[in-house]
Amino acid sequence: MADETTVAPVSGTILVVGGGISGITTALEAAEVGYEVFIVEKNPSLGGRVAQLNKYFPKLCPPSCGLEINFQRIKKNKDIKWFTLTEVEKISGGPGNYDVALKQSPRYVNGNCTCCGKCADACETEIPNVFNFGMDNRKAAYLPHEMAFPQRYVIDPSIIGSKAAQACKDACPYNAVDLDDKVKSFNIKVASIVWATGWNPYDATKMDNLSFGKVQNVITNMMMERLAAANGPTKGKMVRPSDGKTVNNIAFVQCAGSRDENHLPFCSYICCLASLKQTTYIREANPESKATIYYIDLRTPGRYEKFYKKVKEDANVSFVKGKVAKIEEDPATKDVIVTVEDTLSGKKIQARYEMVVLATGMEPSTATVKVPGNAKYDENSFVIPAEILATGCVKKPSDVMSSGQTATGTALKAIQMVRR
């Protein structure tokens, strides 16, 4: 059963809130040893941040590697039920006997959908593509992305009641477009709850000196992932936003918000690795290209040190120890001017680049949307596992591999709570 709201109260069921890699892993580990699991995801599809990556560690695989296998496991497991476009409104009760109120937003497309795409073909209205961080537009009738699970289109609520919405309905040969779809509220009974709502990129506009949102060719590390992806806004071409020019000279600014008492006081763990990885994107796209990484300290824990050494051997990748003071734009060329003090030489540097990538930090989703129940947090709004368990990046900054590992352990804890 998927995306259905007729759920009977079940004693011993585990609720996983968040359908990213951590939530999916927790759900599968519990379900595959015989426990019933509900997955609740606020977006139209499962997959989370991993689905937005071009490649991920440790093997630099595309996200289709891990996600497709996990989606197949979910589809084949009768003990997993998922609810997309759904949020937790309220949690009552305690371990062993939770009553959870859910709200499901309308999708306006029912289970008859075959992903033929005729609704999108008929829709003339476009909206910003949030999957690509607004770097392009998509039709208001859309599949979230090519790997989306479930494979079902969505009609954006902004066009409901318009001619564009009616055109979508008229174009569908399977009677799958339901413009009368409504918000649904319902309750489920569960024995344990795992919060796995992940992270959000830190808002780069809060760092005024780095000029994100003011200088067009300054982007974030997650935007860089989408640029490099074959299903991204440029189909994987390394071009800059202002004019579509191929990028041959790029800079990466580390700790953009992280390790800063005015923003995120903690290290976000993956930012250095992400920038090292992204230098390979630009270098592979153009062997003549050059990349510079501005850093405070480079942190590559465990086996990732080997990857750092490999990147460092590339003569076209430079490393400058120093905190970037200012980023400006050359109005004539749209190039980006970076001002930084080189900590090792003591010299002030002003360098020109075609594009700059900010390594923005990880902010737990609970920094903005709290758990509507009895949850505990640390001083940075990460969830401390207690009555309500937590896993993945809502618990601490993590990479994909460690997120999967902690999710397995969390599944065991959830099972122990059920069996008390």
Q: Which residues does each PLM region occupy?
A:
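Residues forming the flavin
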Residues: M1-R420
